[in-house]
Amino acid sequence: NLVKYKYAGGLYPINAKREMIWGVTCYKDFASLPEKPDHVLVLVPARFAVQVIRDAAAAGARSATIVTSGFSELQDEESQRLAAELKQAIKETGLAVTGPNCLGNLSAGENLFTNIDDRIVTMEQGAVAIAGQSGAIVMAIRQALEDRGVGVGYMVTTGNESGLETPDLMSYFAADPSIRVIVVYLEGVRNTKVFRDACKAARAAGKPVI
């Protein structure tokens, strides 16, 4: 989708076994990249994700989306251990991270769509922002709005929320002048104060939270 919608920023796939992916040159590791990455999309097996986050931060990245599953959504000891290690790595590196176990994000104004959805997306900076833990439901909400001619400026799937949580996104959307309506899907609220503060920020900005 990054190629399909002609994202204008640099695209630097890291894959030691391939030279090209979708016509885009691959690099063997972070050290080989021609410039510092701004955002890293993590698609490696769970056992490698923690090191990728640390390597991304060392390479100068500021944020990451971890699509990889196999963490706290599973109950086995190894998955729980990896989840704890990932959370610690995010804390230590200071990266702004969505996921793991999520389905990517949309920033329409930037033609940035890191989701596997192959349905047509109108890349216009709409006035609605969506965030939530269930990627499938968030994607369904976006599609329902799209079908009704309602523009979606941002869509963020947060998954297990090892880093950023949905209320963090709500606060960001509340401060963004391009957004008029905030839609969220919550499976739970870990920090009720942060959630209340995000709701208050949206109310102060005159933006309904649905």
What does each of the following model-derived ranges do?
Residues N1-I210:
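Catalytic-core regions of core metabolic enzymes
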